[in-house]
Protein backbone atom coordinates (compact mmCIF):
# COMPACT_ATOMS: atom_id res chain seq x y z
CA UNK A 1 0.00 0.00 0.00
CA UNK A 2 1.27 3.48 -0.82
CA UNK A 3 2.27 5.60 2.16
CA UNK A 4 -0.82 7.29 3.53
CA UNK A 5 -0.63 9.94 6.24
CA UNK A 6 -1.37 8.10 9.51
CA UNK A 7 -1.62 11.47 11.29
CA UNK A 8 -4.95 12.01 9.51
CA UNK A 9 -6.56 8.98 11.18
CA UNK A 10 -9.14 10.18 13.69
CA UNK A 11 -9.42 13.62 12.09
CA UNK A 12 -12.74 15.13 11.10
CA UNK A 13 -13.27 15.96 7.43
CA UNK A 14 -15.97 17.88 5.61
CA UNK A 15 -17.12 16.65 2.20
CA UNK A 16 -17.51 19.29 -0.50
CA UNK A 17 -21.29 18.68 -0.36
CA UNK A 18 -21.29 19.45 3.37
CA UNK A 19 -21.35 16.16 5.29
CA UNK A 20 -18.92 15.65 8.18
CA UNK A 21 -16.92 12.45 8.53
CA UNK A 22 -14.13 11.00 10.68
CA UNK A 23 -11.32 9.08 8.99
CA UNK A 24 -11.25 5.73 10.83
CA UNK A 25 -8.27 4.23 9.04
CA UNK A 26 -6.87 2.75 5.87
CA UNK A 27 -7.46 -0.66 4.30
CA UNK A 28 -6.69 -2.55 1.10
CA UNK A 29 -9.17 -3.88 -1.44
CA UNK A 30 -8.99 -7.68 -1.15
CA UNK A 31 -8.89 -8.20 -4.92
CA UNK A 32 -6.84 -5.30 -6.26
CA UNK A 33 -4.89 -4.26 -3.12
CA UNK A 34 -5.90 -0.67 -3.90
CA UNK A 35 -5.52 1.58 -0.82
CA UNK A 36 -8.89 2.52 0.65
CA UNK A 37 -10.07 5.05 3.23
CA UNK A 38 -12.50 3.86 5.88
CA UNK A 39 -14.55 6.73 7.25
CA UNK A 40 -17.53 7.27 9.52
CA UNK A 41 -20.43 9.63 8.94
CA UNK A 42 -20.86 12.07 11.83
CA UNK A 43 -24.50 12.85 11.02
CA UNK A 44 -27.77 10.96 10.82
CA UNK A 45 -27.42 7.31 11.73
CA UNK A 46 -23.69 7.43 11.05
CA UNK A 47 -22.29 4.34 9.43
CA UNK A 48 -18.97 3.32 7.97
CA UNK A 49 -18.03 4.03 4.38
CA UNK A 50 -15.13 2.95 2.17
CA UNK A 51 -13.72 4.89 -0.76
CA UNK A 52 -10.48 4.51 -2.74
CA UNK A 53 -7.82 6.69 -1.08
CA UNK A 54 -6.99 8.25 -4.44
CA UNK A 55 -10.60 9.43 -4.74
CA UNK A 56 -10.88 10.50 -1.07
CA UNK A 57 -7.91 12.86 -1.39
CA UNK A 58 -8.47 14.07 -4.97
CA UNK A 59 -9.68 17.45 -6.13
CA UNK A 60 -13.06 17.60 -7.85
CA UNK A 61 -14.42 19.90 -10.53
CA UNK A 62 -18.18 20.36 -10.21
CA UNK A 63 -20.47 23.21 -11.26
CA UNK A 64 -19.95 25.89 -8.62
CA UNK A 65 -17.09 24.10 -6.85
CA UNK A 66 -13.46 23.33 -7.55
CA UNK A 67 -11.29 21.90 -4.79
CA UNK A 68 -10.70 18.91 -2.54
CA UNK A 69 -13.40 16.26 -2.20
CA UNK A 70 -12.72 16.15 1.58
CA UNK A 71 -11.01 18.81 3.71
CA UNK A 72 -9.72 18.43 7.25
CA UNK A 73 -11.80 20.40 9.74
CA UNK A 74 -9.31 22.58 11.60
CA UNK A 75 -9.66 23.45 15.27
Regions found by a protein language model. Name each.
Residues 1-75:
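Mixed-charge, low-complexity intrinsically disordered regions
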Amino acid sequence: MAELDKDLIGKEFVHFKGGHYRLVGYAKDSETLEPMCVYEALYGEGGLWVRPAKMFFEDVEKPGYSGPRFKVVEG
